Amino acid sequence: MAKIKHGFSGQRLIVYPFYVIEQALNNPLVADLVVHSMGYFPKAESHYIDRASGCGEYLLIYCTKGEGWYVLDGKRYVVPENHFFILPAEKPHQYGSSEHDPWYIYWAHFKGKKAKYISDQLQGVIPIDMDDNSRIGDRIAFFDELLNVLESGTDEATVNYVNLSFNHLIASFLYVKTYREAKFSKSKAENTFFISLATHFMTENLENKLTLKELASHFGYSESYMYRLFFKETGYAPMNYFLHMKIDRA
């Protein structure tokens, strides 16, 4: 089967001209992290790259579906769905798509003063675990947004926007836990405040026969939602918690 570098149906591929990259590397505002090129290859069948001398940039590859592999320092690594890796600059490497389950990848070549530090922090194949707060869709949407901007032109403002924004994208890979919590910290704080209100209401009703229905009704929630939220935040069913409060009071 033929080996293909690019040209996949539905692909996106943008490479900045040499002079644009040089200008960015000499611009103190963005010089520490500069995008060379970015792209998206969906269902990249027969994708294969062999760089015997490496390349002049660092390379981030994020597999969002399917499977691929890469070889670095004589070791072969498998790259499953929702995993990413970074290849260092100037080092021989090969990478490609699985023959049986071709990968879908977002990728970016980048350079600058921070590039080596970023690469050193993100070695090997790194998972992006799925959970309710994974924000995988947010990261992909941001990749697509940067590709849109890359396609829109090479004026200074556009290039600066891409390079400054790329810092945020890299941060989402470097600090996955923080990236996830950033979006949900407000709702977490709101839930904590709600629990304090609920327990205060319980305290005021220790002499009464409070029911889950009455508790939920007081806050305008359904009984099932009230139960789930309270249990999630405290580890106790609401009425069991209320019973413990009564026992402690006695």
Identify the residue ranges that each predicted region occupies.
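An amphipathic alpha-helical interaction segment
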Residues: 108-109, 113-117, 121, 131-203, ...
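N-terminal regulatory/effector-sensing and dimerization cores
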Residues: 21-23, 30-125
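A short, N-terminal "cap"/entry segment at the start of jelly-roll beta-barrel domains
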Residues: 1-34, 51, 128, 149, ...
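Basic/polar phosphate-binding segments, predominantly the helix-turn-helix DNA-binding elements
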Residues: 197, 201-247
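Residue-level marker of regulatory loop/turn positions in helix-turn-helix DNA-binding domains and
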Residues: 27, 52-53, 187, 191, ...
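Short, hydrophobic secondary-structure boundary micro-motifs
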Residues: 71, 96, 158, 181-185, ...
